[in-house]
């Protein structure tokens, strides 16, 4: 995620907007793929992984498994959040990433307060993914609008062939 700020800034400065779009797509594909695989690993082997750190406390293992299942299943959203946030920052935008961060905190707090009362610990665990969604929505919209706006810039200069 964080490398996207430098990547986007360098390519923006070079006027190579298509490369920004291509890089974000490739980074998103890699990150989402890895996140989905790790989410599956968390769900299938979560109990075994937790057992490496917790022994003899079945209630701790059970609650940790709930946490891993809920959060691990949504890491792909978090990966997109980081990619969009840092790409926008690299393109010189600060308002939307800041607004998205505020939205993330508010959504997380609201979800924790409401859902914990309704669903207990599982509801509290849902606060993170819902906060990520609340932040990712404005970031993804801003990213798409920004890329559309930047597509009107002059095309990237041709690479000289030596």
Where are these regions (language model features)?
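Residue-level recognition of transmembrane alpha-helices
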Residues: 31, 68-71, 75, 101-102, ...
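Small-residue-rich hydrophobic transmembrane alpha-helices
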Residues: 1-40, 44-46, 78-92, 96-100
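Short membrane-interface helical motifs at transmembrane helix boundaries
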Residues: 37-58, 65
């Amino acid at each position: 995620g964080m490398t996207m700020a430098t990547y986007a800034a360098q390519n923006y400065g070079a006027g190579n907007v298509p490369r920004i779009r291509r890089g974000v797509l490739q980074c998103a594909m890699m990150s989402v793929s890895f996140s989905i695989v790790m989410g599956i690993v968390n769900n299938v082997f979560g109990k075994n992984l937790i057992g490496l750190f917790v022994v003899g406390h079945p209630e701790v293992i059970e609650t940790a498994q709930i946490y891993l299942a809920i959060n691990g299943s949504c890491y792909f959203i978090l990966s997109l959040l980081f990619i969009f946030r840092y790409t926008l920052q690299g393109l010189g935008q600060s308002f939307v990433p800041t607004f998205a961060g505020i939205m993330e905190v508010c959504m997380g707090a609201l979800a924790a307060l409401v859902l914990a009362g309704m669903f207990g610990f599982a509801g509290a665990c849902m606060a993170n993914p819902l906060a990520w969604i609340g932040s990712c929505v404005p970031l993804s919209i801003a990213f798409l609008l920004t890329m559309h706006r930047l597509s009107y810039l002059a095309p990237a200069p041709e690479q000289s062939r030596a």
